[in-house]
Amino acid sequence: MNIIISNNSSVAIYEQIKNAIKDAIISNELKEEEMLPSVRNLANDLKISFLTVKKAYDELEAEGFIKTVQGKGSFVAPKNLEIIKEEKLKEVQDHIEKIYNISKIANISEDEIKELFNMIFKGEI
């Protein structure tokens, strides 16, 4: 797993780490029960504070993506398909909200948006 962070991003560094690990889990790049780098090792590799990595790991654990075993390390949690579905559904919702906002500004009707969605689902676009 290769995590690339950007100091110029508006997204906090711990969020970038969290998102990269989540994406690796969802895409199956990281397998169930696979050990993650230790907090300190990842912090050293990324040249950032271990507290930043710890915050990312803590949030991933709270969200059910990883589990930490005292004295052994952090591991990819068994996949909860419902968690993954909720995560992706939220992502879709965010995109739909952006589409809605753009359509309001551009005075695009609901029917026009529905027609575009239908064409996309039918593979016509």
Protein language model features and the residues they cover:
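Extreme N-terminal segment that seeds HTH/winged-HTH DNA-binding domains in transcriptional regulators
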Residues: 1-35, 41, 90-93, 97-125
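Short, cationic-aromatic polyanion-contact patches
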Residues: 14, 38, 72-88
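Beta-hairpin "wing" of winged helix-turn-helix
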Residues: 29-30, 34, 62-71, 77-78
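A short alpha-helical element within helix-turn-helix/winged-helix DNA-binding domains
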Residues: 35-46, 60
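Residue cluster at the C-terminal edge of the helix-turn-helix DNA-binding motif
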Residues: 45, 59-65, 106, 123
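Short secondary-structure transition/capping segments
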Residues: 46, 77-86, 113-124
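Key DNA-contact positions within bacterial/archaeal DNA-binding proteins
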Residues: 51
